[in-house]
Amino acid sequence: MAKVLISTEISKPYAHWKNVFDSLESERAKVAIKNIYVGHEAGNEKKCHILFEVPNPEVLKKFMFDPKNAARMNEAGLIRESSKITVCSD
């Protein structure tokens, strides 16, 4: 299983973003995407970091670009152009 780190910025309050993120948990589980860490930088709730474990990075990419999921992430305040995605070694 690959690990993927996403660092991103959000435009809405962290609590709102996290609530929407959590609401997608069952959808992520259906495609074997597991949350390892979800949080924000100390002192900066607008800069979030998420570490996922995935069967392969393409599964996560497909999930993120699914129109329904993308719309929900946009509603949560995700600033997509700020996102940096790093596939980590095992």
Regions from the language model: what does each represent?
Residues 1-70, 79-90:
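Short S/T/G/P-rich N-terminal loop/turn motif that feeds into the first structured element of a domain
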